[in-house]
């Protein structure tokens, strides 16, 4: 940055008769511009791109975002109106080591395999899987019959039939 080519120095000598140097203020401004944001992200541009100003605050924002991301939204609490969750949460790394034990546990209870704090897969027993598939097939059959016959029913009756309290939803 501070070194000048020989040809440029020679040109300055010839034009003035002595060595000319650029003012220190312009050099400082040029260096300061390099240290800050790129030209397309100056002053009001920071707001348009939703970046913090000055640039040194960016690392703090990322740190805060990282910290909040570790509190995953999948907790053992049940959502309003949902069924209680009676499954055990197991990290995938532990599941690799104890797969046979987890398969035995899945006969009694569902096992949720977690990857980085988020549910990745659910291990259920073969009987439960078959019953869920049968129930799904029955519901699809009922839906196709209702669609063919254009049957309508009140929402309260439908909620009672499905076992859902419509007033709470």
Curated annotation (Swiss-Prot):
InterPro entries: Antitoxin_Phd/YefM (IPR006442), phD/YefM_antitoxin (IPR051405), YefM-like_sf (IPR036165)
Originating organism: Mycobacterium tuberculosis (strain ATCC 25618 / H37Rv)
Protein name (Swiss-Prot/TrEMBL): Putative antitoxin Rv0268c
Function: Putative antitoxin component of a type II toxin-antitoxin (TA) system; however the expected toxin coding sequence is not found adjacent to this gene.
Sequence ranges of Basic residues compositional bias: 1-11
S-S bonds: none
Similarity field: Belongs to the phD/YefM antitoxin family.
NCBIfam families linked to this entry: phd_fam (TIGR01552)
GO terms of biological process kind: regulation of DNA-templated transcription
Coiled-coil annotated residue ranges, if any: 120-153
Phylogenetic classification of the source organism: Bacteria, Bacillati, Actinomycetota, Actinomycetes, Mycobacteriales
